[in-house]
């Protein structure tokens, strides 16, 4: 919400929320997945009494993004200086391969990226690595502004390592990145769209990703919302049983709609507009659900389904000079 709808939130509430999350940081650097209403810091996805293994592989990156977005909106670099050490510890907690990509040991599967936190991806991971690169670039910029050249160089190098090595997940035949290198070695629609949206240096790969999204529009979009995998695929492994076609195993989500629309706008603006019109029409008629499918809807009034596309559409309008 802070990234895409900061103007809709009280500034002090955002600041206090960040400090509350960081207050729950463990000694090993792990930051909470969430805080309960009673103040309990919860580190793993799933119910408190039945966690889905170790903490997800994106908590550290989102913590950095949260602080960076707050500083960007407020200009409060002193706030960054005050919490910078905690952010470094959080990033150091993340498990990474020799090539710098975020990884999950196949012998110890657990939640990866939050919007696939029930999916048993293992090995080197696409989405969490994209987030790590993005967070590292943000930290490099913030440390440079704060006058810490050594830290800026460190995180710039971490981002550069991912930029050089993410190609190990590239499927040349499909022209798309795979979600993971071991388990769930499948085309990741969200991850590829986000790579474009996040400005990852793709070179010639970008044209192929955009082409895949356009050609497979009917397999990945329904009522303006986006599947994690091309229809009719489901994930090879899950951490808990999930019926194919539902939730994170084949339902369609508004969370990623803005990323896909942004990506398509570069070469197929009419197709991007079609997606956005379908999304808005569906929200007006039925409401904004967490995810949907034919004869299936889950969790109405899901805030991310609204604010993620909002942020992406604002950015698209600004970058492509749309009214």
Role assignments for model-derived ranges:
Residues 1-101, 126-129, 254-264, 272, ...:
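Aromatic-rich carbohydrate-recognition surfaces in CAZymes
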Residues 2, 6-8, 44-60, 116-131, ...:
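Solvent-exposed loop and edge beta-strand segments that line ligand/cofactor-binding
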Residues 9-24, 77-95, 135, 139, ...:
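Extended, well-ordered alpha-helical scaffold segments
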Residues 27, 31, 111, 115, ...:
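Glycine-rich, flexible loop/turn motifs
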Residues 32, 103-105, 121-125, 131-231, ...:
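Catalytic cores of carbohydrate-active enzymes
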Residues 41-42, 112-113, 282:
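A short local loop/turn or secondary-structure capping micro-motif enriched for an aromatic residue
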Residues 100-119:
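Short, flexible helix-coil linker/hinge segments at the edges of structured domains or between repeats
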Residues 222-240, 249-251:
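A glycine-rich, aromatic-flanked flexible loop/lid motif
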